[in-house]
Amino acid sequence: VTAAAKTPSGSIFAGSSDREDVDVYQDGEKTTIRVEDPTDAMIAVPVSGGEDSVYRINRRTTIIQNINVADKSAGAVLRVGLGVGTITPGAQGMALATDTIGKQFGVYLTNDVIRLHQTTPTTGAPWAIAWDDKRQQVWVATTDDNKIRRYQLGSGQGEELEAYNSIENTQSLVALPDGMILAASATGTDVQVITP
C-alpha cells in the first residue's frame, strides 16, 4: 500500500503504486475496486450533508479519478494537465491538484462524476498544495524558484495574492486551522512557518 485515505464515516480506501485496484475496508469487510492505473496518492474529502469524496492520482499517466464511496466503484478519469504532482483536500468535496510540468493547479469537484472546476497558472513549477480553510484560499509551493504563493479562488481562475521565499525543495505544505502555514523540505530537515 502506497496511498490510503479514511473517510469521516470510517471507511478506509487503500491503493498501491504497483497494482491496478483500490481496496475498501468498511464494517470489517474488504471490497476490491478495479482501476485502470496504479495509485500514487489518495485523499478523502468530507462533504457536510452529503456523500464524502475520495480521489486518487497516477503520476505516470497524469490522471485524477474519483472513487464512488456509496457503491464502492471507480468513477470517471480526467487528465491533470501535463504532469500531476500532488493532491490535497479542499472544502466540501473539493480536491486541489498541482500540474508540475504545466505550471498550474486545478480545482476538482465531484457530485455524481468528477469535474474540473477551474485551473490557475502558477509562476513556478508547483508541487505541494494546501487548502487554507480559515481564509478559503490556496497555498502552493513551487520547487523551481523556492516560493510559496497564496491564491484567492475566483469565478474564472485564481488570483495570486502574495509570494514568500521558501526553504529549498518544499514538497510538503499544510495549512493549520488557525491559519498558520507549515512547509517542509524533501531534501533536508528544515521546516518553515508562515504566519500571514
Model-predicted regions and their roles:
Residues D23-Q26, N66-N68, Y108-D112, T142, ...:
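Structural recognition of the beta-propeller blade-terminating site
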Residues V1-S9, V35-S48, L82-Q92, G124-D132, ...:
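Repeated scaffold domains used in trafficking and secretory/extracellular systems
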Residues K6-P8, F13-D18, V47-R60, A95-I101, ...:
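Conserved beta-strand positions in repeat-built beta-propeller and related beta-rich domains
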Residues E168-P196:
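Blade-level signature of beta-propeller repeat domains, shared across WD40, Kelch, NHL, RCC1
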Residues M94-I167:
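Intrinsically disordered, low-complexity segments enriched in Gly and acidic/Ser/Thr residues
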Residues R59-V113:
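Aromatic-anchored, glycine/proline-accented short structural segments
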Residues E20-D23, T62-I64, K103-F105, N146-I148, ...:
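Structural signal for beta-propeller blades
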Residues V1, D27-V35, D71-R79, V113-T120, ...:
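A short beta-strand motif characteristic of beta-propeller blades
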